[in-house]
């Protein structure tokens, strides 16, 4: 396929929009940003905060550590966003918070000054923060995307508003007339200088991986597996290096490390999963700089392409689809053939389809480990000319039909699953 200039620009712009630095899990960060913007308009520290979030944002904010605070949950996200957040920081809203501000936020929580509840909203991704100080109050709403401020109100006066198209109705999809082979062809033929920016993903996520190997964050799965090599319980081979280095980055991210991840489709874990396997394999192969750049771009673009067929948040764990992106990048590094990519992604769909998202938490690193393991296993099968065939399950003989089948299940059939997961999570008894 020959890509017109306008389409080329649109594809690159989409990657630049979806692959951005993010400090901390992006759902609580979205609420922190709403609170930070509200504080900017309030002009003073709040006496109390009322926050409302969509069910999916509640699910993804309940069990994850807010970076730089050592504290789990949306109450901390709202408090620290209002006290120390940078309203212009986007997904790095909490980059410059101080220990003193964290202490202030914890005191507000201790004094029961923060209330977070579920909003009855049409938006899958929605956060609202209302800050109060004496007789002043400011309300800010974010919807559809993690940094998309759609509403600002102060003391009942509307200061800013813009329409927000429901995610599923968004017609402006750059991938509408593209398929997986087009994604592959574009990544290999686009001018190198136009996609060099993707190298930053390797830099940021490699630093996060090293942080996860240096300290115990979250479930410290990567660090645990690294220790087992020294004990002779697992081997120091390419598969385990992929798993260890990718999972360590997720450990650090979910465990509250004060380092940004390069995200993909609004998720740090998806960005990590789309990046680190490619970095590890490129290093193993002593790949050239151009090979690394193109493999990274192919990985991230394929991940975005697949995720574009999904709701922004759903019951399907999206690191599985991000791993299909890195599957493409790694398979290209090892074979240079689209056929291997097609075979491997088909096998992944036959393997890990249906892994549920039960909220952002330290256990996300387990799903990262599972997904990248499936990816490499599927690539090895393709190298041996083997794959899950179109005669089995939801896999079809054509890769895009298989991808569409997976995403249809996530978008439709798994919506009840999502509601059930959220119901279970919000009704669990609090730990003592």
UniProtKB/Swiss-Prot annotation:
The protein's name in its UniProt record: UPF0597 protein APJL_1638
Entry-linked InterPro entries: Ser_deHydtase-like_asu (IPR005130), UPF0597 (IPR021144)
Pfam families xref list: SDH_alpha
Family to which the UniProt record says this protein belongs: Belongs to the UPF0597 family.
Coiled-coil portions: none
Top-rank taxon, per record: Bacteria
A single BP term in Gene Ontology: L-cysteine catabolic process to pyruvate
GO MF: L-cysteine desulfhydrase activity
